[in-house]
From Swiss-Prot:
Biased composition (Low complexity): 62-82
Name by which UniProt lists this protein: CDP-diacylglycerol--glycerol-3-phosphate 3-phosphatidyltransferase 1, chloroplastic/mitochondrial
Location(s) in or outside the cell: Plastid, Chloroplast membrane; Mitochondrion membrane
A single cellular component GO annotation: Golgi apparatus
Record-level GO BP terms: chloroplast organization; phosphatidylglycerol biosynthetic process; phospholipid biosynthetic process; photosynthetic electron transport in photosystem II; regulation of embryonic development; thylakoid membrane organization
Gene: PGPS1
Region described as Disordered: spans on this chain: 62-103
Function: Catalyzes the committed step to the synthesis of the acidic phospholipids, including phosphatidylglycerol (PG). Transfers specifically a phosphatidyl group from CDP-diacylglycerol to glycerol-3-phosphate to form phosphatidylglycerophosphate. Cannot catalyze the phosphatidyl group transfer to inositol, serine, choline or phosphatidylglycerol. Possesses high activity with CDP-dipalmitoylglycerol and low activity with CDP-dioleoylglycerol.
Enzyme Commission identifier(s): 2.7.8.5
């Protein structure tokens, strides 16, 4: 009787030590205590069934709460790398991975490559002195202008934007516009009262091409600086109006270069001067924004 009473006292003391919550939780030590407690409880289960079952219930509660605290993500683990290989953060300003494509030859990029490949065809058909040469040149330029809008729309709508496409798109636009301007300057426009005027299209062409070269260099420099400079050179509504008038003017001039319709040629030349003025104006606006950022 004395030995059995002493054994029950030892079991009760061990159970109380086990059930006492410790400030620092150690999983191996806690596991060893559970094993020892289960051994003692199996020996004394016939004498103290109610007390042991109650202690085991409390023991399982503390074990589950401790393991849940260990499995709960801490503040340091919230900033760990996610499954996509990107650092998780609370900033929602960055686009989700599905908005950009890892493929190089997406549909918008193929359309952009088609514009680059159309530049030699534009040059070849421009020097064909016939009506179908004029029609082919104008059709190629119109198709390039349409795909310029279409590839950007598809990249946003279908989430097929890529870094290669973002680099190639402005290059294709500048190649097409610069080639068309140079081609038009090689064949002076005939004005009935004044005869050929070789400078009529040369002046706005120099302004437009010079502006595009300057903005390309400025954007390349801004990309290597802070984010505020990139915001300063972002495309604005003035640049969109410049592009619209530029494409319209070049289409009219290509379609009417062998035509005797004076007002059509004059309207195309007038729109080209408007486009040149908008180009210089937008360049001044960009430079003013950049100057404000640099002076802060």
């Amino acid at each position: 009787m004395l030995r059995s009473g002493l054994a029950s006292l030892i079991v009760d003391v061990n159970l109380r030590r086990t059930l006492r919550p410790s400030p620092t939780f150690s999983f191996p030590a806690h596991l060893s205590r559970c094993i020892i407690t289960s051994r003692y409880s199996s020996r004394t289960s016939l004498r103290f069934p109610i007390q042991i079952s109650r202690h085991q219930h409390r023991l399982s509660y503390f074990s589950s709460s401790s393991s849940s605290e260990q499995s709960r993500p801490t503040s340091s683990s919230r900033n760990s790398f996610s499954g996509h290989g990107q650092l998780d953060s609370d900033d929602n300003s960055s686009p989700p991975p599905s908005q950009s494509s890892s493929k190089v030859l997406t549909l918008p990029t193929v359309l952009t490559l088609g514009r680059v490949a159309a530049v030699p065809l534009l040059v070849a058909t421009f020097y064909v002195d016939s009506w179908w040469g004029t029609t082919a040149t104008t059709s190629i330029f119109i198709a390039a202008a349409i795909t310029d809008w279409l590839d950007g729309y598809l990249a946003r709508k279908m989430r097929l934007g890529s870094a290669f496409g973002a680099f190639l798109d402005p290059v294709a636009d500048k190649l097409m516009v610069a080639a068309t301007l140079i081609l038009l300057c090689t064949k002076p426009i005939q004005v009935a009262e004044l005869g050929p005027l070789p400078w009529l299209l040369t002046v706005p062409s120099i302004a437009i091409i010079g502006r595009e070269i300057t903005m390309s260099a400025v954007r390349e420099w801004a990309a290597s600086q802070n984010g505020k400079l990139l915001e300063a050179v972002a495309v604005n509504n003035l640049g969109k109006w410049k592009t619209a008038t530029q494409m319209t003017a070049l289409t009219i001039l290509l379609a009417s270069r062998d035509s005797n319709v004076g007002w059509l040629v004059a309207s195309g030349a007038g729109l080209l001067y408007v486009s040149a003025g908008l180009s210089v104006w937008s360049l001044a606006v960009y430079m003013r924004k950049i100057w404000k950022v640099l002076m802060k």
